[in-house]
Amino acid sequence: MTDKLIIFDTTLRDGEQSPGASMTRDEKLRIARQLERLRVDVIEAGFAASSNGDFESVQAIARAVKDSTVCSLARANDRDIARAAEALKEANRARIHTFIATSALHMEKKLRMTPEQVLEQARQAVRFARNLVEDIEFSPEDGYRSDPDFLCRVIETVIAEGATTINVPDTVGYAIPELYGNFIKNLRERIPNSDKAIWSVHCHNDLGMAVANSLAGVKIGGARQVECTINGLGERAGNCSLEEVVMAVKTRRDYFGLDVGIDTQHIVAASRMVSQTTGFVVQPNKAVVGANAFAHASGIHQDGVLKARDTYEIMRAEDVGWSANKIVLGKLSGRNAFKQRLQELGVQLESEGEINVAFAKFKELADRKSEIFDEDILALVSDESVTSEKEQFGFVSLAQHSETGERPEATIVFTVDGKEVRSSSEGNGPVDASMKAIEAHVRSGAEMVLYSVNAISGSTESQGEVTVRLQSAGRVVNGVGADPDIVVASAKAYLSALNKLQSKAERVAAQG
């Protein structure tokens, strides 16, 4: 008989804290549905008390998700916890995840509280939360750098008050696998009521060991929940990567002896969706989901794989969702075929109206591009104009003129709160001219800190996926746009970033 390892995904909360990774409510909802399709056990949907936007996102996900537990983060105070409970009240399965820092450094410098005050606040927070929902997770922030004696007191206290999951974060990615695993093990052995809660690990990747540390926490420490994100998304160097930890446990089941409930065939679709939504491109050599993860360039390797796949492959590409048949649709494909492919890719649009809009855009793309790939479809449905969420700025059309030796000029038509406007400008190139044309009307004053182009598929017909990162008043957002015309994709990306810049509320920083 084997144990089950609980997969707790925090892409929508901790992952979104990565600079520029802000997502709209509808984007979060699409990703949450994909996570449910992936059979993630717990989805941390956000930090409900941090902003009205986050509250609405958590609330929408709690209503939509039926099988996974939906969780909201909350600081260890009554206001945050009550706000989380309110956002989660329609969830089939709700969890409140409350936290307070326990390291001497954090208590003294950040909280300006004594250890006894922190202990009491943790006690009161879990007691209050337990009266609102049954499933309570407690995290001692910066737990790995906390004094073990004090940490034992805090954890024993919150378990006694009803905490059902104890999560021990390596908040700054300082841990080493063997040391972290033994740290968890020693806590469990020293705390008398440790068996009354499930133990969890949450590791950051600052030293490149988030996955290794998480696995050590499971194997050595006895943890039975891993907190992770799709593509390892997260602030600084990121978080533990869901796809890597899941495939490590499944591939080396002989060593870990654990079951995971993840439907791994949806991993690649989830990775693509998160990448195209946030604008964070997956590196080609990324384990499991990188474009080269199952590629063999060496002649010796190629020969071996052709003779017997297991000579150089420890898992099958199709088991994680890589499709051998890349070309899926064309200009003669009908609405039902398009809708079926969306379902196969794990994409669920909210209404028939959204499917109709997406299909119209698909037909428009098919008239310009003979072969439609999965990546094209995911980029298409990631377009903000497909969803029902109202955006301040929307792309309509673009015309540009450029000749060798002359400054290019662009004229763009776009909507502002539903009304069409036309603006023109010259620039150093057609992309520069199009963005200056937008700014000539909008006058956002935002600084562009990143511009990148990624080919969605491999031919000269490929759509270009452009990421634009804007910074204004301390806020950083990414906008993504896709089109076979790079200039049009750039304009779409710029407008997407402006939408996020306009809608992004000031958030309370949530570490952990």
Curated annotation (Swiss-Prot):
Mn(2+) binds at residues 14, 202, 204, 239. GO terms for cellular component: cytosol. CDD domains: DRE_TIM_IPMS. Belongs to the alpha-IPM synthase/homocitrate synthase family. LeuA type 1 subfamily. The keyword Lyase does not apply. Its cofactor is Mn(2+). Residues 5-268 form the Pyruvate carboxyltransferase domain. It is found in: Cytoplasm. It is an enzyme of class 2 (transferase). Catalyzes the condensation of the acetyl group of acetyl-CoA with 3-methyl-2-oxobutanoate (2-ketoisovalerate) to form 3-carboxy-3-hydroxy-4-methylpentanoate (2-isopropylmalate). Its main location: cytoplasm. Its EC number is 2.3.3.13. The keyword Cytoplasm applies. Pathway: Amino-acid biosynthesis; L-leucine biosynthesis; L-leucine from 3-methyl-2-oxobutanoate: step 1/4. This is 2-isopropylmalate synthase. InterPro entries: 2-IPM_HCS-like, 2-isopropylmalate_synth_dimer, AIPM/Hcit_synth_CS, Aldolase_TIM, LeuA/HCS_post-cat, LeuA_allosteric_dom_sf, LeuA_bact_synth, PYR_CT. Pfam families: HCS_D2, HMGL-like, LeuA_dimer. Keywords: Amino-acid biosynthesis, Branched-chain amino acid biosynthesis, Cytoplasm, Leucine biosynthesis, Manganese, Metal-binding, Transferase. Residues 394-512 are annotated as: Regulatory domain. Homodimer. It catalyses: 3-methyl-2-oxobutanoate + acetyl-CoA + H2O = (2S)-2-isopropylmalate + CoA + H(+). It comes from the Bacteria.
